[in-house]
Curated annotation (Swiss-Prot):
Any one Gene Ontology cellular component term annotated for this protein: riboflavin synthase complex
Enzyme class: transferase
Amino-acid positions noted as binding 5-amino-6-(D-ribitylamino)uracil in the UniProt annotation, renumbered to this chain: 25, 57-59, 80-82, 113
NCBIfam families: lumazine-synth
Catalytic activity entry: (2S)-2-hydroxy-3-oxobutyl phosphate + 5-amino-6-(D-ribitylamino)uracil = 6,7-dimethyl-8-(1-D-ribityl)lumazine + phosphate + 2 H2O + H(+)
Record's protein name: 6,7-dimethyl-8-ribityllumazine synthase
Binding annotation for (2S)-2-hydroxy-3-oxobutyl phosphate: 85-86, 127
Gene Ontology MF, one: 6,7-dimethyl-8-ribityllumazine synthase activity
Protein role: Catalyzes the formation of 6,7-dimethyl-8-ribityllumazine by condensation of 5-amino-6-(D-ribitylamino)uracil with 3,4-dihydroxy-2-butanone 4-phosphate. This is the penultimate step in the biosynthesis of riboflavin.
EC number: 2.5.1.78
Gene responsible for this protein: ribH
Active-site residues annotated for this sequence: 88 (proton donor)
Amino acid sequence: MSGDGSPEIEVDGSGLRVAVVAARWHAETMDGLLAGARRALEASGVTEVTEVRVPGAFELPVAAARLARAGHDAVVALGVVIRGGTPHFDYVCDAATQGLTQVAVTTGVPIGFGVLTVDNEAQALHRAGLRGSREDKGAEAVLAALETVVALRGVAPLPQG
């Protein structure tokens, strides 16, 4: 859901329990991502929201797994990883992406992927939903997760237990 080709999504999320897990690194960008996520949740009618903060993107999967298993209908993961001069960027991006994918597949709970993997801070800020930003990835991650919950409920609801 990036750039000019992103779909227009409106989802009725009333009655859904949603968790947002957000990293702390890159505070200005994270403030924008969280604000966008909150706006999208409110606009979609979601009133039961749990927010959890973790140190960085590497910690997102374990928190997302715990929240998914705690009965949330969807989990939204927000973070920022900015490329540096070492392979650390690749390791963290891969761990976050693979970890969040594993959580979604093993739990059956949709994960909204709002982890920015960028080359520099300017790219992150342009995607953070701040005044003057080109994109609002926090909101997009929420809408993707909610739309997936609604789509799956119609064809393959999770067993209650």
